[in-house]
Swiss-Prot record:
ATP-binding among keywords: no
Protein's recorded name: Immunoglobulin kappa variable 2-24
Signal peptide boundaries: 1-19
Disulfide bond entries: 43-113
Swiss-Prot/TrEMBL keywords: Adaptive immunity, Cell membrane, Disulfide bond, Immunity, Immunoglobulin, Immunoglobulin domain, Membrane, Secreted, Signal
Amino acid sequence: MRLLAQLLGLLMLWVPGSSGDIVMTQTPLSSPVTLGQPASISCRSSQSLVHSDGNTYLSWLQQRPGQPPRLLIYKISNRFSGVPDRFSGSGAGTDFTLKISRVEAEDVGVYYCMQATQFP
């Protein structure tokens, strides 16, 4: 019973939405696109994502229908291995953008921005 109380105590140390949490907001939530045309998604963090080591740990992930998420971009603008160069990332501090220069049919899916500067 004592162990259970200790575990519960540890779980209660992190309260989502508390002042130290970083909240990520993406816009638009959905967007119709035209094949061959550019598209972009914006992501804003509630506080700077610059880590104490000087890096900014902002990543973009793509989840195609029926598949797990895959990493597209890491540390703002670095394309992961095998990611086409039509994908690019930019931004700094709290504001970031994922751009697709020419949308292709295989780009359909859900896109996520993710920070790894701060963990609960």
